[in-house]
Amino acid sequence: MEYRLDNYTRSPQFLLDRLAANCKARRLEKGYSRRTLSDLTGIPAPTIERFERTGKISLESFCQIAILFDYFDEVAALLNHTKYSTSKELETINRNQNRKNGR
């Protein structure tokens, strides 16, 4: 397999690492310790430490942190609009736009 930078930068782990690094940066900008962030969000301090180290955290806990740092609108806007890469994919999206379930 040919190595390309995209193999890493477009991976789930890359996103997790970026989100964790960004959250840690916001925490430090606010002057919060992990304990303070824990007290403000109800997320255990060891969970926050693991998140900052590995990027692993529940979506609910991530949302609590995002809300505390006033990123509610940005998180709510994720996946908010349709993306497509081919005209056939766009046709499928348009055909399925009003579907309520997968069948």
Please state what every model-predicted region is.
Residues 21-37, 95-103:
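Short basic helix-loop element that most often maps to the first helix and adjoining turn
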Residues 23, 34, 45, 59-62:
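Helix-turn-helix DNA-binding elements, focusing on the entry/boundary residues of the two helices
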Residues 31-49:
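Short alpha-helical DNA-recognition segment
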Residues 54-68:
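Short, basic-rich loop-to-helix N-cap that marks the start of a DNA-contacting helix
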Residues 72-73:
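Short, charged/polar surface micro-motifs in flexible loops or helix N-caps
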Residues 26, 40, 51, 78:
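Residues in the recognition helix of alpha-helical DNA-binding motifs
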Residues 2-28:
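A short, Lys/Arg-rich alpha-helix, primarily the initiator
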Residues 76-103:
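Short, charged recognition helix plus adjacent turn
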